[in-house]
Amino acid sequence: MGYDYVHVAVDDHSRLAYVEVLPDERGATCAGFLRRAGAFFAGYGITIERVMTDNAWCYRRSRDFRAAVAELGAVQRFIKPHCPWTNGKAERFNQTLAYEWAYARVFDSSAQRVDSLPAWLHGYNHHRPHTALAGKPPISRVTNVPRFDI
């Protein structure tokens, strides 16, 4: 089966999440992901001001990734080494993603699991209640969404 690299972006205010499963964690791949995440969030009227990442090479040393951050007009921040809780919202989302999507059931293939991601992510963003959001889904914190999109 090989490995899948799950790339995640979570909005700090709303907890709205964007996820892609990609073949690697190279700088150019991560930069492409960030650009697409920026377009996703822009579609909801969310401007990316800061990008917080861990200290992996693809984030810290990649010119492509730094260029993508600059294109968004954002500032890049790094977590303190060996302190993933610094990026707690994304780390908590990763746990939810693993428990409720990736390992929630047995898939026949990685492709089947990846194919199930859009529906799961829609449910997460639009319907899943969050304790930190008073039992409301992330989309409820996004004020620029037409009612038909909820």
Describe the residue ranges of each PLM region.
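Residue-level detector of anion-binding/catalytic polar loops
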Residues: 47, 75
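RNase H-like two-metal-ion nuclease catalytic core shared by retroviral integrases
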Residues: 53-57, 62-69, 76-99, 111-119, ...
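Histidine-centered active-site/metal-ligand motif
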Residues: 7, 76, 130
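Short small-residue beta-strand/loop micro-motif enriched in glycine and branched aliphatics
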Residues: 16-20, 77-79
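Active-site beta-loop-alpha junctions of metal-dependent nucleic acid enzymes
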Residues: 2-3, 20-44
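Buried hydrophobic side chains on well-structured beta-strands
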Residues: 15, 51-53
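C-terminal domain-tail junction helix/linker
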Residues: 70-72, 96-150
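Mobile-element integrase/transposase regions
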Residues: 1-10, 16, 32, 150
